Amino acid sequence: MRGASGESVLPEDLRSRVLERIRPTRLQFSMLGRLYSLVARALEECEDLRLSIPSYRVELVGSAAKGTLLRDKWEVDVFLLLDAPREEVRRLGESLLRSCLGGRLPYYFKYSEHPYATVSLMGMQADVVPAPLAVDPRDAVGVERTPFHTRYVRSRLEERPWLVDDILLFKSFLKGIGVYGAETRVGGFSGYLAEVLIIHHGGFEETVKAASSWRPPVMVDTTSGKADLDMLARRYPDSPIIVPDPVDPSRNTAASVTPKRLAELVHAANIFLRKPSPTFFHALQPGEPCRRTLPGVMVLMSGNYSDHPPDSVWGRLKRLGERLYRATKARGYPALSYSFYTDEALEAAVYIHMESPSRYPIEGRLGPPPWERERAARFTEKRLGEGGWVWIGDDGRLSGARPYTGSAAGDVERALATLPLPPGTRSYKVVTCPSTGPCGFPSYLEALRDPTPPWLRHVLGGCRS
């Protein structure tokens, strides 16, 4: 992509500098290949597996198989494709993996739409996923499509191998601005979606330029007219962006993208086109935090979160943040936004950003019309009994006000008593941060208090030392 002067928007020296930091190394591929071989051998030599489901295939999938993994990702995805009905795979998958991996490799289980094992060895990880062996991607559901996605991307990159670098750049860009990942924690762009967009638009700069002009609802037809976009719009009415899956055009591969993450990409793309900077790319971002924190209220939770699926914990945290934000606004506090965090092990937190964790000392109340005699009498007695005020407005209804002596922390405590907490939570406490200064939290929790992305402060000069 060229700018008005005919020069590339991404300077060549910056492109080279970023790629030098994010390209996977030969050593990385070699070691990950060895990890895959160890896992594949454990599965292929597993007698219990051969006796239970004789026909199966072990397949390397995902970014490592496509050559599109970032240098800091020492992970492989291994699918155990079983020639058996989906129900049987779900019934036997976990026990078979335990039998095949036990005693040979260190592993632990995670639970998503399929239970899967994570082998952890020498700082590397291999996710081992049992799935039914599907012949047609239209018969696959969820992660079962991953082998088809891998084959599709590999075939396109064999035709245009130079796009590998552009995919790496785009993934690093998405990661740098905080919108990379389809999991609930992020609600952003999956690695596969990033690859599909680069293949469709023909490069990193072309994709960023296209994104800069997006306005919801966004439609990006990556299927050369094979997809029924009207049908997809009806099927995914809440999706701000629809990108048909090239291997199954009836599916929106951008279904995980939230309005917030789409808007963040559009905003970042426009700023990047105006002011390219290494700070947009995750591998070149400054190590020192760049923050200007806001006052507010922090809810600190502790529990056993590792016993629950991460998406379940993150999803509940997000809903808790939304409801506390609405509750504090409804109580008259100048709430601005919210953020949330969990280490997926022992702690979680929600922070409500506010102009100030205080509110007006008077609270208004709308009452009934006087002809609703009992209600009107109760309303009047209650307001005056509180040392407040009562009057009749121009609309003929009773109105009132009362002194308000509550606190933001107290109101959040009362709201928490009625709201579902993340699964595994054992206890919590509420802390008020009255100013923009430090509130005594560890750095990763203080980061929740600044709703402005660090990259944005660095790029546009809002970061003060």
Swiss-Prot record:
Q: Which reaction does it catalyse?
A: a tRNA precursor + 2 CTP + ATP = a tRNA with a 3' CCA end + 3 diphosphate; a tRNA with a 3' CCA end + 2 CTP + ATP = a tRNA with a 3' CCACCA end + 3 diphosphate
What Pfam families does the record tag this protein with? NTP_transf_2 (PF01909), tRNA_NucTransf2 (PF09249)
Q: Does the keyword Cell division apply?
A: no
**Signal peptide start and end residues:** none
Enzyme Commission designation = 2.7.7.72
Residue positions annotated to bind ATP are 63, 66, 149, 171, 180
GO MF annotation terms: ATP binding; CCA tRNA nucleotidyltransferase activity; magnesium ion binding; tRNA binding
Gene3D superfamilies assigned to the protein according to its UniProt record, in alphabetical order: Beta Polymerase, domain 2, CCA tRNA nucleotidyltransferase, domain 2, Poly(A) polymerase predicted RNA binding domain
Q: Tell me the residue numbers annotated for binding Mg(2+).
A: 75, 77, 127
Q: What class of enzyme is it?
A: transferase
Q: Which superkingdom heads the taxonomic lineage of this protein's source?
A: Archaea
| Keywords associated with the record | ATP-binding, Magnesium, Metal-binding, Nucleotide-binding, Nucleotidyltransferase, RNA repair, RNA-binding, Transferase, tRNA processing
State the needed cofactors, names only: Mg(2+)
Residues involved in CTP binding: 63, 66, 149, 171, 180
Q: Which GO terms describe its biological process?
A: RNA repair; tRNA 3'-terminal CCA addition
Share what the entry says about its subunit structure, partners included. Homodimer.
Q: What else is known?
A: A single active site specifically recognizes both ATP and CTP and is responsible for their addition.
Functionally, this protein is described as follows: Catalyzes the addition and repair of the essential 3'-terminal CCA sequence in tRNAs without using a nucleic acid template. Adds these three nucleotides in the order of C, C, and A to the tRNA nucleotide-73, using CTP and ATP as substrates and producing inorganic pyrophosphate. tRNA 3'-terminal CCA addition is required both for tRNA processing and repair. Also involved in tRNA surveillance by mediating tandem CCA addition to generate a CCACCA at the 3' terminus of unstable tRNAs. While stable tRNAs receive only 3'-terminal CCA, unstable tRNAs are marked with CCACCA and rapidly degraded.
Q: Name the family.
A: Belongs to the tRNA nucleotidyltransferase/poly(A) polymerase family. Archaeal CCA-adding enzyme subfamily.
Q: Which HAMAP family match?
A: CCA_arch (MF_01264)
NCBIfam families linked to this entry: cca_archaeal (TIGR03671)
Protein name, per record: CCA-adding enzyme
